[in-house]
């Protein structure tokens, strides 16, 4: 092996976690290589996950907005599009993101190697390139940031042309009139919004008793209602017995005895870590049944010189958190210990239509913990900015301690929820008495804005105290 093939650190995977680690390590002066199995950087987040699905959702929401606004939609004329047509919008965003991220590596003189990596001993990896050639690289330390992929159970034929997962759905060429989505987690709910927004008949099969049960119950109920109101058929507490591909579609047989037929099926029930091809045994590691590896507070595995970040270590499995974990693992590699760690209250952003975001505790969690809390609410339909924009569906809810007035949780349902949440998050992150709902009463907001919902909700909540 040539001396040029040895690095201080090799990062496997160029998604958010790998990027954060590589940038932190190169800026600290280390000689870093990053291995990427695809032909361009960005990982699953950029190419199959966060970026394309949100670009699709944006395009669909604009179509809905146009068709529901009488100013634009006159004489009963409306615009229509298909999933395959709006994929072009997603591709343009992916290309921009890829070029941006490629520039990060170029400017920071980080060595990029394209190919599939696997360990061959404790300090060496083999990289199989697209032309079939194999190259060996060694390093003092490694960071595994290989992400995750959609879980594919053995008894589902994903080779059938009408059965998709959340990656392959982005290659959808035909235009379905009816889709079944199996799995009502975040991905399933987001795609249910997209397809229903395009006018596709949508059946959403949920393996649990309510949608997104980790959310505040009121938010979960609101999503269920809006899905129902838009025509999405939700089947709760169902498990598939058999998925049968036909010449022109798919039939799903449920254990409850029901069966349903559609033009295609999107299987969106779980994800698994991308570790099966790494040959972890060669370095003394073993992944669990979900393809994930365990790490300590410094993102260090049981093998001292091997670290891991992102989806491959499990919760919270968010692109934003993975990038932060990458920065923190760079600190751990350089200084022996991570100087910072993920914040306790990580915000959740769910890009359904309407959008959802939350941070902190839910009402059911506070009730179970016997915390004396109060609720402040603001309805978007009463906000001037929402009325102007025609986005008056939604609300903001603040949960706060009755005695200390400390903000305990914030839950937003409606347009721009994932943006609005960060105003409240910033106050929640303040220490001691600085975290108080009274901030929203004592500050001055721009008018008209969606942010004004915080002032309205704060006044509503404080007026409940006695």
From Swiss-Prot:
Its cofactor is FAD. It is found in: Cytoplasm. One of its GO terms (molecular function) is dihydrolipoyl dehydrogenase (NADH) activity. InterPro entries: Class-I_Pyr_Nuc-Dis_Oxidored (IPR050151), FAD/NAD-bd_sf (IPR036188), FAD/NAD-binding_dom (IPR023753), FAD/NAD-linked_Rdtase_dimer_sf (IPR016156), Pyr_nuc-diS_OxRdtase (IPR001100), Pyr_nucl-diS_OxRdtase_dimer (IPR004099), STH_gammaproteobact (IPR022962). It holds the Pfam family Pyr_redox_2. It comes from the Bacteria. Keywords: Cytoplasm, FAD, Flavoprotein, NAD, NADP, Oxidoreductase. This is Soluble pyridine nucleotide transhydrogenase. HAMAP family: SthA. Conversion of NADPH, generated by peripheral catabolic pathways, to NADH, which can enter the respiratory chain for energy generation. One of its GO terms (cellular component) is cytosol. One of its GO terms (biological process) is 2-oxoglutarate metabolic process. NCBIfam families: PRK05249.1. Belongs to the class-I pyridine nucleotide-disulfide oxidoreductase family. Its main location: cytoplasm. Binds 1 FAD per subunit. FAD binds at residues 36-45.
């Amino acid at each position: 092996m040539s001396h040029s093939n040895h690095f201080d650190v090799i990062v496997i995977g160029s998604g958010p976690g790998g990027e954060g680690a590589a940038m932190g390590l190169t800026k600290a002066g280390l000689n870093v290589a990053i291995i990427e199995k695809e032909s361009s950087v960005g990982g699953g987040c950029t190419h199959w996950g966060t970026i394309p699905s949100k670009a699709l959702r944006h395009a669909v929401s604009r179509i809905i907005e146009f068709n529901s606004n009488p100013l634009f939609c006159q004489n009963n004329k409306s615009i229509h599009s298909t999933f395959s047509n709006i994929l072009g919008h997603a591709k343009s965003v992916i290309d921009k993101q890829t070029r941006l991220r490629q520039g990060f590596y170029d400017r920071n003189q980080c060595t990029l190697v394209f190919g599939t990596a696997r360990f061959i001993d404790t300090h060496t990896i083999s990289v199989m390139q697209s032309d079939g050639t194999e190259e060996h690289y060694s390093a003092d330390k490694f960071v595994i940031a290989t992400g995750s992929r959609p879980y594919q159970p053995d008894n589902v034929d994903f080779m059938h042309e009408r059965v998709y997962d959340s990656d392959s759905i982005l290659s959808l060429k035909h235009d379905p009139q009816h889709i079944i989505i199996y799995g009502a987690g975040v991905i399933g709910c987001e795609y249910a919004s997209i397809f229903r927004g395009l006018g596709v008949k949508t059946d959403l099969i949920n393996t649990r008793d309510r949608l997104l049960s980790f959310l505040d119950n009121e938010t979960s109920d609101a999503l269920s209602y809006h899905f129902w109101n838009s025509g999405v058929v939700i089947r709760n507490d169902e498990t598939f017995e058999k998925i049968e591909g036909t010449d022109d579609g798919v039939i799903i047989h449920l254990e409850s005895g029901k069966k349903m037929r559609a033009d295609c099926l999107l299987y969106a029930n779980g994800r698994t870590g991308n570790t099966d091809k790494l040959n972890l045994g060669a370095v003394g590691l073993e992944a669990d049944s979900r393809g994930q590896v365990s790490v300590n507070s410094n993102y260090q595995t049981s093998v001292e010189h091997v670290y891991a970040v992102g989806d491959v270590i499990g919760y919270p499995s968010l692109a934003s958190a993975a990038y932060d974990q990458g920065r923190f693992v760079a600190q751990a590699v350089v200084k022996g210990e991570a100087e910072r760690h993920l914040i306790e209250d990580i915000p959740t952003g769910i890009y359904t239509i309407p959008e959802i975001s939350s941070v902190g505790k839910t009402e059911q969690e506070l009730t179970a913990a016997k915390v004396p809390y109060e609720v402040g609410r603001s309805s978007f339909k009463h906000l001037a900015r929402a009325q102007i924009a025609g986005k008056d569906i939604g609300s903001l809810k603040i949960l706060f301690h009755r005695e200390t007035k400390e903000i305990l949780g914030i839950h937003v349902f409606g347009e721009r929820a994932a943006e609005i949440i960060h105003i409240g998050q910033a106050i929640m992150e303040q220490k001691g008495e600085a975290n108080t709902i009274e901030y929203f009463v004592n500050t001055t907001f721009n008018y008209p804005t969606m942010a004004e919902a915080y002032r309205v909700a704060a006044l509503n909540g404080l007026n409940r105290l006695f």
